């Protein structure tokens, strides 16, 4: 059974890592980022809900009888 020739593995792996790094750098450099981001002021809105203005009755279950 012949032995596996691993003499070129270092060159192949190193060139692959370098090319992936270059490709990643090109992908990242193509994106445009905002230079001066401004904070947005968030305004809270008050919702008028009908159950906030009046009390609601709470009923006991039918199985509980108070005498």
Curated annotation (Swiss-Prot):
PTM annotation (N6-acetyllysine): residues: 54, 57
Keywords, ordered alphabetically: Acetylation, ATP synthesis, CF(0), Hydrogen ion transport, Ion transport, Membrane, Mitochondrion, Transmembrane, Transmembrane helix, Transport
Single GO biological process annotation from the record: proton motive force-driven ATP synthesis
Chief place where the protein resides: mitochondrion
Location(s), subcellular: Mitochondrion membrane
GO function term, MF aspect, one: proton transmembrane transporter activity
Superkingdom of this protein's organism: Eukaryota
Pfam (any one): ATP-synt_8
Any one cellular-component term (Gene Ontology): proton-transporting ATP synthase complex
InterPro entries (UniProt xref): ATP8_mammal, ATP8_metazoa
Membrane-crossing residue ranges in chain numbering: 8-24
Modified residues (N6-succinyllysine): 54
Membrane topology, record value: Single-pass membrane protein
Functional summary from the UniProt entry: Subunit 8, of the mitochondrial membrane ATP synthase complex (F(1)F(0) ATP synthase or Complex V) that produces ATP from ADP in the presence of a proton gradient across the membrane which is generated by electron transport complexes of the respiratory chain. ATP synthase complex consist of a soluble F(1) head domain - the catalytic core - and a membrane F(1) domain - the membrane proton channel. These two domains are linked by a central stalk rotating inside the F(1) region and a stationary peripheral stalk.
Family: Belongs to the ATPase protein 8 family.
Assembly information from the UniProt record: Component of the ATP synthase complex composed at least of ATP5F1A/subunit alpha, ATP5F1B/subunit beta, ATP5MC1/subunit c (homooctomer), MT-ATP6/subunit a, MT-ATP8/subunit 8, ATP5ME/subunit e, ATP5MF/subunit f, ATP5MG/subunit g, ATP5MK/subunit k, ATP5MJ/subunit j, ATP5F1C/subunit gamma, ATP5F1D/subunit delta, ATP5F1E/subunit epsilon, ATP5PF/subunit F6, ATP5PB/subunit b, ATP5PD/subunit d, ATP5PO/subunit OSCP.
UniProt name for this protein: ATP synthase F(0) complex subunit 8
Organism the protein comes from: Cavia porcellus
Taxonomic lineage of the native organism: Eukaryota, Metazoa, Chordata, Craniata, Vertebrata
């Amino acid at each position: 059974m012949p032995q596996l020739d691993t003499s070129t593995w270092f060159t192949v792996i190193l060139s692959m890592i370098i090319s992936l790094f270059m490709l990643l750098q090109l992908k990242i450099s193509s994106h445009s980022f905002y230079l001066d981001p401004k904070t947005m002021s968030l305004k809270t809105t008050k919702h008028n809900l009908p159950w906030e203005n009046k009390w609601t009755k709470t009923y006991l279950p039918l199985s509980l009888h108070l005498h």
